[in-house]
Structure formats: structure tokens, C-alpha cells
UniProtKB/Swiss-Prot annotation:
Name under which the protein is recorded: Protein transport protein SEC24 B
Subcellular location: Cytoplasmic vesicle, COPII-coated vesicle membrane; Endoplasmic reticulum membrane; Golgi apparatus membrane
GO cellular component: COPII vesicle coat; endoplasmic reticulum membrane; Golgi membrane
Tissue: Mainly expressed in pollen, roots, stems, petioles and hypocotyls, and, to a lower extent, in leaves and cotyledons.
Species of origin: Arabidopsis thaliana
Length: 1096
């Protein structure tokens, strides 16, 4: 009999009886840690909390609510079709009296501290009052019963295909009873309707007459050309009613013992003195990735068009005969209201990963959705760029699209989603395929009365272990399939046996390395780092497994003996920075419970100890190597606070900025070489760190060039992260530094991880891309993997796939939880194969397609000139649209730009990418290096906001009393939408800009900033909350955005009258014509012209 898994991963001080609230709440405002909803109104970014001793017992952690079951369906679900393997378990499915494996439903905490559903009496997540139950029929994502089946083409209508987006260029078509322009869909900016034409019209209102018949097939296929369209549609699947929406994970943000908060200004230099007394850090929600709110970066989910409205065209078909090339008119004749722009959505939807045993295309990442895992893994964990797999490499090549997976295995789930089940097979371990080593999953088919199974990945027929056998039902499924999570859930955690362990699971080791050079002391960076570390000590896991260490460095390295037996910490100096060593290794890293008092005393005194330091040098490389030697036997997290360019010792660097001095402009010749590491020293060190499971996170608090391209190699190779605070201000950056450090420590994460993706026969992994170390071709090593990190897995064909069959993908992540348990997280995805090009375009996933384009551009920037990278990104977009225009929409006039519905925003996002920080011809080299590193591990939901930010009108917040969402609908990034009388807020997930027009009403300025004119605003802006409705709403908006982005935005002030501030803000108006490139309208004209050229 298998032993059950202890419920849930261990989290520090999970004591529901603890009288103190979590550190991210206002203490005293709630007595019960579960009463999250009642406390949401207290999440004010400028309210100082009462004193809270940093060394006291840790309050209930953020993700410490009891799990709540997923809302049950209120409608009768249809019986699964025969051979429908995956399916939802019944209500009491997890309680099995016997037989392996045992399933652990996480109790107080799910594995790795994942957020779970809070109590049912709480309002919807986001802290807004409940508006009643969420009825599937009213807000759920369309639940198609899979994808249209391949088959012969249907009838050929006389208009553009359903799902296509025509944009007319030239003179508007004549209006009459039989022809009218498509009406706006109601989204901001008036995008076209996404639905199919009315019954019987077949798109006739933009028709150019019937297509010619008898078109020959093109030369692009060998043998008979496959049909383009099938008669299948996207019918709605079953709907169900969910319970009330749940509250979010608790917020992040308020450090103990905080004083007044100071804001940030991008225009003034921070003072050259040590940090002032601790500031009041805003307390705002810090939760899951961006899902709720304004959904500004994509259209809301819509019913996918049915096939009968699409023309039957032939794969390889060329342009229509006698087709004339219409000249492109001036942009002034284009109806701006018909240009595709991101829309917005409101209420959450419920999304089932499979419906009637067929894959269900995922909703956009910009939609707030609750996933019901019915066989495929949630799209939060794994997304495919195309939700139907092309059967041949030729078909994929013709489409021009990427075939890749974006995998985020530790992603935060929605609070109302079912936590990931933990399955324990005992000493035998999970059932696996003998040939490919794939793990048992819902798509393995059991035969011979359950005595054998067929692997869905390699096709091998294997013997079922005797203690895992079970009879089959009349539908061919195992009778216990719905009772076993591994047979009915796309995502599951297996308990790993000793077979998966090279050594015992590593303890939780946190080592802090602080720059105390003269510049770091004078700018206040050292004091800010010490203050942040001291405040997060209470957030570290408690218990005997938690160890800490600390060291400082300038031109030498200083370790500290923190043994309790000593009256005070003892400094141990390492002067040799060429051949470093660690003195008294056993005394440098000690249990947190033994050294907490000494550690707090040391952190308070470090800024004073080095106050008179005159050493401008930094032995960064040597200090990191010495800290690694101390951690070599255990592994762990090394957090480095760096302020100046490493100049002495191992890995010393010189200022490479443009041979000239000052700043390296990205537009200079061969500038891309400055984005490559100076040498291989730090890279070689990083590979060794990864081998011993040491993850390095880098906090760069600088006011000058630090050669980000070189030093970021360490975190990128070890699964870490780079945080950049440039130019560092002791008045405004400590709040962000504290919140970044706290989230780094408390977010769900795993350690000493190894990941591999397996694919069905015919598809194989081509390449992995992200923050990791790769020593063998098939696996990637991750000393740490957290909920914010994503990995791109590009795929390629190695054989032809069968049309109508399903292609399977399985990602397996072996990792150690924060509590020291070894687990295997398995993600499964099974999606259909198709021979029809039109199906590829219909099922394309814009979010992951663009995320791949973004990551590939970032990978190419260090090795290519910027104009070439921009040109490649634009050409990729044109290739995709040309393929659709040529093979799927050849019946329309060349005077129209036809965009596939699923990818209608691809031109806008491509334009935004070419104008973004990474591809601008001006700017600092370090800024570009940071951008490249940031994009490397960026998750899919954050990819589009990074290049196409969200902008809202702050001055109109008072008028949005009836809005469901805290964050109002976004405004297009076009200067014509900016009023001189308005105040606007723009955010991209990293930075927030407040733009103030020249003629803003003094009452608005008084309410928001407590001044009568913009000239009175101080250079160091402080975001305050005043006693009026507008100020309160703006603070709520900032809090909500920070929660959505899981990021503490650096807020900067941009006044139109100030040249630098105005230029900074205008650089984000990507739809305008400017030095960065063409306007959105001009770009569409250019894309259309190039498509016409290719067609001719």
C-alpha cells in the first residue's frame, strides 16, 4: 500500500491562529487571516503601518489560505464519447480507499506555496464586491468541441473568408443596399466585428464578385494538394455555472517599521549621501500574473467563425488571374476606426481545457479566465503557438508561423482554480513508458483489459505494472480513470523516489552579498540593500532547514561569522581577489534561527562601518566566486547588490562604452558587440555555479555604466534574475528594492531542477531558450525556477503527421520544494494535427506567437545590427500575412489588406516591437542589455504589454463610477488621444509614467498632487493619497496594476512642458510617426504594399 503524501508543501509558520496579520497587510485591520476580502480596502500605497518588529514570529504567509474546491457544474454534462480518455473526477474522486498511488490534496498549502482559493464568503478576486455567481452562458469562453475536421472544401462564397479582416485602401467602396462597411464591434477604437457575416450574406457586403473557377494548384506541394477548408465549425461546448469569484492572493509591499514614502523622478539626480531613515513603502497587492482588469492587449474571446463562411481554396494556389494591383492611397483616406486595435473585456470566464474529448483553444492571456483542467494542462503552464499542428514541414513553412511551446511550469494559478494534485506511487515511482520514459498521462490508451498501455508519445505498447492494473469500462477507459489525477488531469505533481535524487534535497540557503564601495555608500545603495534584507528576514522560511550568510565587498571581500556563541558578528577579510577562498566555511553560513539577532545587528551597522570608505573599486567577480565557494556544498540562492563596474580581481571589466567616454549610443557602428560579454570568465564561473545548484539574482543599484551584458551572464545561466534601478535614487528606489527582494524570496519556486520536453512521433524539440544551463541536448538545468520564469521550446518536424490524429507534448520538471520534498511536475498537452493551412491561421495563438517573435529578436540583437533585426521582425510579420492573403483569401480585391482574425493585431505589435527599447537606435547600452535579459525569461502574459503598454486617462477616473473594473479601458498609444487638459498613466509592467498636459485644470492637480499648477510639482515626485475620490481611485488603479503585473512599478513624472519628460513619454506613443519608425497607418500601408509586391 502506498503511503499518502503529507498534505501540502511546508511553508513558514503556517499558523492560522497567529494573531498578527501577514506583513503585507495593515496590522490590526483584521483579526482573522482568512478575512481577506474585508481588508482589501486597506491596501493603500501610502498608509504607513504601525511598527512591526522585523524579528518577531512570522505571520501567516501570503498563500496560506485553505484550499477551496472548484465550483461545481450546475448543468448536466454530456456523457463522454467512446474512447474519451480524459475527464473530470467526480466530487469525491480523490478519496480512494486503497491501491496505489495515493493522492495528496494539499491542505494548508499547495505544493511550493501555490495560491489556492480563499474562503467562499470572500468577494471576487481583485477585492471587488461580488456581483453574483458567474454563469457560464453569460461570460464563459466559447467552448468549441475541438477543431474543424479536415475534409473537402465546402461551397465558395463571394466575399472574404469568415474570420478575415479586410481593411480597405484607396477610395471607400460605394455604399448601397447590398454593400456596407463592417460595423465597429464596440471595442475602443472601433475594431471590426470578429464574428462571421450574417447567415446568407457570406461576407457579401465587401464582395468583389464570384471567384474564377478552375484555378490550378500551385507548385508548393508534392503530390495532390491538400484541401484548405473543412466543413467543421466551432460549436459551443457545454456550459456550466461557477460559484462566486474568489479573492486574490494577499498583497505585497509593506515592510515593517516604515516611515514616510518618497516618490521617484526620472529627471533629477539622486543625492550623494547615505540613505535617509526607513521610508514608508506602499502596500499593494502582489499576486498572480496579469489577467484581470482592463484586458487592453487583445480582443475579448469571441465565438470562432464557422467554416461554411470561408472560401474553399487550394494549398499552393497563386494569385487570381487578371488580378490588377490597386495603387495604395494616401493614409488620410483610411478609416481609422476600422484599424484593428486591442479591445477590452470585463467579467472572468471559465475555460475547460478539453471539451467532449477534444482540445479547446485557450483564451487570450489578456482575458481573466478560470481554468478547469479536463485533460490538457492549463495554458498558464504551457501554450502552443498554433493550436493545431501542421502535418508536414512544408505546410508549416508556407504559413510562415512559428511552431513552439511557451512553458511556465511554476506559474501562479487563479485563486479559484483547483490546486495541482500530488500523487505518490510509493517506492516504485510513477508509471513510465519503457521506451521514451514518458510519464503516465490522460492520453495513454490502456488495452487488453488494462494489462497493457500504448504510449501516446512514442507509440510503444508496454506492460502495465500489476499493482496499477484496472479493468476497462465499455467506453474503453479504465474504470478508475476519473479517480486518478494522473489519468484525468493535464497537470500533476508526482512524488519523486530516491531514484531521482543524486543527493539529499538541498536546504534553503540564502546568501546576501552587498557592495560597500565608495559610490554605493555615498548614493545610499548600501543602506537601501541592508534595510531591504533586514525587512525580509521575517519572510524567510522558518525551521532548521533555513540557512543564511552575508558578505560585503569593495576592493576586498569581507565575510562575517554569525555564530551565536560570539557576542557580536566577527568580520573575516579576504584580501586576495585573484585567488579567492572562504575562511571558516562552516561559520559563514549558519541556521537562521541561530543567528537572527546577530544578523539584524550587522545589517544595521554595515552602512556606518563603511561610511568613511574611500575605495572606488569593486571586486564583484571575486566576491561572487568566494560566496559560491561557501555555498558549494549546499547550493542555494545568492543575492548580489551591485553598484559600480567590476574593476578588480576575477572577472574585472573595463568601461567599453564607445571607446569615446560618457555614454555608448546604441546607434553607433558595431554597437551590438557591446551587448556581448567582454570575455568568457563570468560565463565559465556561471556554468560551475549551475552545476552545484547555486542560483544568482542580481540587484543593480547604479548611476553609471556597469557592463550589464557581461555581469548578467551569471543570473541568466543560473536561472536567476536581474533587477535594475537606474539611475538609483535613495529617495524613491528603496520601496521597489524591498518589494522586489521580498517577492523574489516568497514567490512559489523550486530548486535544483531539471526539465525536459517530450513530443509525439514526427515532432522533436529543436531548441530551448530562457534562463538556464544546458549541459546535454535533451535537458536543461535550473538551479532555481519560479512562477515568473518562462522557457521557449521551439519544435521541428522529423516526420509527417497523420491528419486528424492528435500530437502530444509532455513537459517534466524535476524539482525540490521549499520544504525539501523532491517532486516531478508533469504538464501534458494533446492537440490535433491538420493538413489545412486555413486551420493553422484560425487556431494561431497571437500571444505566444508574438512572445516567440519577441524572444527571437532579443536573441539576435547582440549578434546583428539593429536595422537588420528590425527588418527581420517586419519580414516575419509580412510573410505570415502574405501566406494568409495568398492561400486563404485569394477571392478578395488586392485593394484590401486582409488579416487573419486570430492575428489581426500582429502588425501593431510588430511595429511596437521595432520601436521598443530593445530596437531603438538611441539609448544606453546597459538599458538594451537589461531589456534583452528581461525578455529572455519573460512570460507570455507580459510579452505584449512590454512593447505595447497600457495607457489610461487619470482625469476621467471620477466618471467611471459604474465601471466593473478598477482599471478603466485603455487608450490607443497615439498622441492625438492626449489632451493638454488631461493627466494620463502609462505602464508596461516595469515602469509607470504619469503624463501631465500643459492646461490641466487646477482642481484636478489639487486633487491628485495637492498643487495648483504643474510648475509647483517637485522634481522628486511623491505619490500620495489625498482625501478625495479622484486621488483614491488613482491609488486603487496603481495598486491593481502592480498586483496584475506582480511587479512594483517605478513611477516617473512626465510634464509636457519639460523636454526630457515629454520626450520620454512620447517615445511610447508607438502608433505615431517618429524617429523610431512609421505611424501605425503608414506601417499598414507599407505591409499591404509589400504583400501586393509578393503577390505580383
Amino acid at each position: 500500500m502506498a503511503a499518502p503524501v503529507p498534505p501540502g508543501a511546508y511553508r513558514p509558520n503556517n499558523n492560522q491562529q497567529n494573531s498578527g496579520g501577514p506583513p503585507n497587510f495593515v496590522p490590526g485591520s483584521q483579526g482573522n487571516p482568512n478575512s481577506l476580502a474585508a481588508n482589501m480596502q486597506n491596501l493603500n500605497i501610502n498608509r504607513p503601518p504601525p511598527p512591526m518588529p522585523g524579528s518577531g514570529p512570522r505571520p501567516s504567509p501570503p498563500f496560506g489560505q485553505s484550499p477551496q474546491s472548484f465550483p461545481q457544474q450546475q448543468q448536466q454534462q454530456p456523457r463522454p464519447s467512446p474512447m474519451a480518455r480524459p475527464g473530470p473526477p467526480p466530487p469525491a474522486a480523490m478519496a480512494r480507499p486503497g491501491g496505489p498511488p495515493q493522492v495528496s490534496q494539499p491542505g494548508g498549502f499547495p505544493p511550493v506555496g501555490r495560491p489556492v482559493a480563499p474562503p467562499s464568503n470572500q468577494p471576487p478576486f481583485g477585492g471587488r464586491p461580488s456581483t453574483g455567481p458567474l454563469v457560464g452562458g453569460g461570460s464563459s469562453f466559447p467552448q468549441p468541441g475541438g477543431f474543424p475536421a479536415s475534409g473537402p472544401p465546402g461551397g465558395v462564397p463571394s466575399g472574404p473568408p469568415s474570420g478575415a479582416r479586410p481593411i480597405g485602401f484607396g477610395s471607400p467602396p460605394p455604399m448601397g443596399p447590398g454593400m456596407s462597411m463592417p460595423p465597429p464591434s464596440g471595442m475602443p477604437g472601433g475594431p471590426l466585428s470578429n464574428g462571421p457575416p450574417p447567415s446568407g450574406m457570406h461576407g457579401g457586403h465587401l464582395s468583389n464578385g464570384p471567384p474564377p473557377s478552375g484555378m490550378p494548384g500551385g507548385p508548393l506541394s508534392n503530390g495532390p494538394p491538400p484541401p484548405m477548408m473543412g466543413p467543421g465549425a466551432f460549436p459551443r461546448g457545454s456550459q456550466f455555472t461557477s460559484g462566486p469569484m474568489m479573492a486574490p492572493p494577499p498583497p505585497y509591499g509593506q515592510p515593517p517599521n516604515a516611515g514616510p514614502f518618497t516618490g521617484n523622478s526620472p529627471l533629477s539626480s539622486p543625492p550623494a549621501h547615505s540613505i535617509p531613515p526607513p521610508t514608508n513603502f506602499p502596500g499593494v497587492p502582489y499576486g498572480r500574473p496579469p489577467m484581470p482588469g482592463g484586458f487592453p492587449y487583445g480582443a475579448p474571446p469571441q465565438q470562432l467563425p464557422s467554416a461554411p463562411g470561408t472560401p474553399g481554396s487550394i494549398y499552393g494556389m497563386g494569385p487570381m488571374q487578371n488580378q490588377s494591383m490597386t495603387s495604395v492611397s494616401s493614409p488620410s483616406k483610411i478609416d481609422l476606426n476600422q484599424i484593428p486595435r486591442p479591445g477590452s473585456s470585463s467579467s472572468p470566464i471559465v475555460y475547460e481545457t478539453r471539451v467532449e474529448n477534444k482540445a479547446n483553444p485557450p483564451p487570450p492571456t489578456t482575458v481573466d479566465y478560470i481554468t478547469r483542467d479536463t485533460g490538457n494542462s492549463s495554458p498558464r503552464y504551457m501554450r502552443c503557438t498554433i493550436n493545431q499542428i501542421p502535418c508536414t514541414v512544408d505546410l508549416l513553412s508556407t504559413s510562415g508561423m512559428q511552431l513552439a511551446l511557451i512553458v511556465q511550469p511554476m506559474a501562479l494559478s487563479h485563486p479559484s482554480e483547483e490546486p495541482i494534485q500530488v500523487v505518490d506511487f510509493g517506492e516504485s515511482g510513477p508509471v513510465r513508458c519503457s521506451r521514451c520514459k514518458g510519464y503516465v498521462n490522460p492520453f495513454m490508451k490502456f488495452i487488453d483489459q488494462g494489462r497493457k498501455f500504448i504510449c501516446n508519445l512514442c507509440g510503444y505498447t508496454d506492460e502495465t505494472p500489476r499493482d496499477y492494473q484496472c479493468n476497462l469500462g465499455p467506453d474503453g477507459r479504465r474504470r478508475d480513470a476519473d479517480e486518478r489525477p494522473e489519468l484525468c488531469r493535464g497537470t500533476v505533481d508526482f512524488v519523486a523516489t530516491k531514484e531521482y535524487m543524486v543527493r539529499d534535497p538541498m536546504p534553503a540557503v540564502y546568501f546576501f552579498l552587498i557592495d560597500v564601495s565608495m559610490n554605493a555608500i555615498q548614493t545610499g545603495a548600501t543602506a537601501a540593500a541592508c534595510s531591504a534584507i533586514q525587512q525580509v528576514l521575517s519572510d524567510l522560511p522558518e525551521g532548521p532547514r533555513t540557512f543564511v550568510g552575508i558578505a560585503t565587498f569593495d576592493s576586498t571581500i569581507h565575510f562575517y561569522n554569525l555564530k551565536r556563541a560570539l557576542q557580536q558578528p566577527l568580520m573575516l577579510i579576504v584580501p586576495d581577489v585573484q585567488d579567492v577562498y572562504t575562511p571558516l566555511e562552516t561559520d559563514v553560513i549558519v541556521q537562521l534561527s541561530e543567528c537572527r539577532q546577530h544578523l539584524e545587528i550587522l545589517l544595521e551597522s554595515i552602512p556606518t562601518m563603511f561610511q568613511e570608505s574611500k575605495s572606488p573599486e569593486s571586486a564583484f567577480g571575486a566576491a561572487v566566486k568566494a560566496a559560491f565557494l561557501a555555498m558549494k556544498s549546499t547550493g542555494g540562492k545568492l543575492m548580489v547588490f551591485q553598484s559600480v563596474l567590476p574593476s578588480v580581481g576575477i572577472g574585472a571589466l573595463s568601461s567599453r562604452e564607445a571607446d569615446g567616454r560618457a555614454n555608448a549610443s546604441a546607434g553607433e557602428k558595431e554597437a551590438h558587440k557591446l551587448l556581448q560579454p567582454a570575455d568568457k570568465t563570468l560565463r565559465t564561473m556561471a556554468i560551475e555555479f549551475a552545476e552545484y545548484q547555486v542560483c544568482v539574482d542580481l540587484f543593480i543599484t547604479t548611476q553609471a555604466y556597469v557592463d550589464m551584458a557581461s555581469i548578467s551572464e551569471i543570473p541568466r545561466t543560473t536561472g536567476g534574475q536581474v533587477y535594475c534601478y537606474y539611475p538609483f535614487s535613495a529617495l524613491s528606489d528603496p520601496p521597489k528594492l524591498y518589494n522586489d527582494l521580498r517577492w523574489n524570496i516568497t514567490r512559489p519556486q523550486g530548486f535544483e531542477a531539471v526539465m525536459r520536453v517530450r513530443c509525439s512521433q514526427g515532432i522533436q524539440v529543436q531548441e530551448y531558450s530562457g534562463n538556464f544551463c544546458k549541459r546535454i541536448p535533451t535537458d536543461i538545468d535550473l538551479p532555481a525556477i519560479d512562477c515568473d520564469k518562462a522557457i521557449m521550446v521551439t519544435l521541428k518536424h522529423d516526420d509527417k503527421l497523420q491528419d486528424g490524429a492528435e500530437c502530444g507534448f509532455q513537459c517534466a520538471l524535476l524539482y525540490t520544494t521549499i520544504s525539501g520534498e523532491r517532486r516531478i511536475r508533469v504538464l501534458n498537452l494533446s492537440i490535433p494535427c491538420t493538413n489545412m493551412l486555413s486551420n493553422l491561421f484560425r487556431s494561431a495563438d497571437l500571444d505566444s506567437q508574438f512572445a516567440c517573435m519577441l524572444k527571437q529578436a532579443a536573441n539576435e540583437i547582440p549578434s546583428k545590427a539593429l536595422p537588420l533585426v528590425k527588418e527581420q521582425a517586419t519580414n516575419d510579420c509580412i510573410t505570415i500575412l502574405h501566406s494568409y492573403r495568398k492561400f486563404c483569401a485569394t477571392v478578395t480585391s488586392t485593394g484590401q489588406l486582409i488579416l487573419p482574425e486570430a492575428l489581426k493585431l500582429l502588425p501593431l505589435y510588430t511595429l511596437a516591437l521595432t520601436k521598443g527599447v530593445g530596437l531603438r537606435m538611441d539609448g544606453r547600452i546597459d538599458d538594451r542589455s537589461f531589456w534583452i535579459n528581461h525578455v529572455s525569461s519573460l512570460s507570455t502574459p507580459l510579452a505584449i504589454p512590454l512593447v505595447y503598454p497600457r495607457m489610461i486617462a487619470v482625469h476621467d477616473l471620477d466618471a467611471n463610477d459604474n465601471e466593473e473594473n478598477v482599471v478603466p479601458c485603455p487608450i490607443p498609444l497615439q498622441s492625438e488621444h492626449l489632451s493638454d487638459e488631461g493627466v494620463y498613466f502609462l505602464e508596461n509592467g516595469e515602469d509607470g509614467l504619469i503624463y501631465i498636459g500643459e492646461s490641466v485644470n487646477s482642481d484636478i492637480l489639487q486633487k491628485l498632487f495637492n498643487v495648483r499648477s504643474a510648475a509647483e510639482l517637485p522634481s522628486q515626485y511623491v505619490l500620495q493619497k489625498y482625501d478625495n475620490q479622484l486621488s483614491k481611485k488613482f491609488n486603487d488603479v496603481v495598486n491593481e496594476i502592480r498586483r496584475q503585473r506582480s511587479s512594483y512599478l517605478r513611477i516617473k513624472l512626465c510634464k509636457k512642458g519639460d523636454p526630457a519628460g515629454n520626450m520620454l513619454f512620447q517615445s511610447y506613443m508607438v502608433e505615431d510617426r517618429g524617429s523610431g519608425g512609421a505611424s501605425y497607418v503608414d506601417f499598414l500601408v507599407s505591409v499591404h504594399r509589400q504583400i501586393q509586391h509578393k503577390l505580383n
